[in-house]
């Protein structure tokens, strides 16, 4: 899976996501761009 390194900011790509209150490598939950 693709994702951002821990601590990196989301740049809006589908491979970005927010988990556990921090930008980490993981899959984006549904509506992440609205709820995040």
From Swiss-Prot:
GO terms for molecular function: calcium channel regulator activity; toxin activity. The keyword DNA repair does not apply. One of its GO terms (cellular component) is host cell presynaptic membrane. Coiled coil: none annotated. Keywords: Calcium channel impairing toxin, Ion channel impairing toxin, Neurotoxin, Presynaptic neurotoxin, Secreted, Toxin, Voltage-gated calcium channel impairing toxin. It is found in: Secreted. Transmembrane segments: none annotated. Expressed by the venom gland. Belongs to the neurotoxin 04 (omega-agtx) family. 01 (type I omega-agtx) subfamily. Omega-agatoxin are antagonist of voltage-gated calcium channels. They block insect neuromuscular transmission presynaptically. This toxin is a blocker of L-type calcium channels (Cav/CACNA1). This is Omega-agatoxin-Aa1b. It comes from Agelenopsis aperta.
């Amino acid at each position: 899976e693709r994702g951002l390194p821990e601590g990196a900011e989301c740049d809006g790509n589908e491979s970005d996501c927010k988990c556990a209150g921090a930008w980490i490598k993981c899959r984006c939950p549904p509506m992440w761009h609205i709820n995040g």
